Amino acid sequence: MRYIPHAYQAYCERQIVEKTALALWLDMGLGKTSITLSAVNELKFNRFEVQKVLVIAPKKVAEATWQAEAAKWDHTKHLRFSTVLGSLQKRIRAVNAPADLYVINRDNVKWLVDYFRNDWPFDMVVIDEASSFKSQQAQRWKALKSVRAHIRRIVELTGTPAPHSLLDLWPQVYLLDQGERLGR
């Protein structure tokens, strides 16, 4: 199917392409996934600015949503996915398979960081449902923070930032700018 973005979608895609760190907070159903896939396609195949993209998502979303959305559109259906889920052996095989995007559930982020240690291969990370990274005490947040300096581009997606307080936003913003705006 031919992708014809709405003006706000085209704007969001440009922002992802032009900025190295961005939070995209749009309501459900407004196309966060297709916007991001379009930007990844542009960055990887037209600008050659990214090689390996990691998508961190809730398990159900990681299982099929990103792949199904990419398959829908003519300009993204060529993207190759590796789903990094399942047993340890399956995850190791998947993370070493050739792909453009690697999709993992958020509960395996610590494992992935431990697996690669100082040889972090993903130059772009997309956090689908960034509000699940609102606790700086969570292992997934600490793990991602430890490799943040090795990530050239990061995009946070959510339709529900819904903090209980401003303190819930600090960890999400920190992952974007490493403490530049709100402190360390």
Locate the predicted segments by residue:
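PAPS/PAP-binding and catalytic site of the sulfotransferase fold
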Residues: 37, 69, 165-177
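Conserved helicase ATPase motor motifs in RecA-like P-loop NTPase domains
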Residues: 28-29, 151-166, 174
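SF2 helicase/translocase NTPase motor core
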Residues: 1-142, 146-152, 181-184
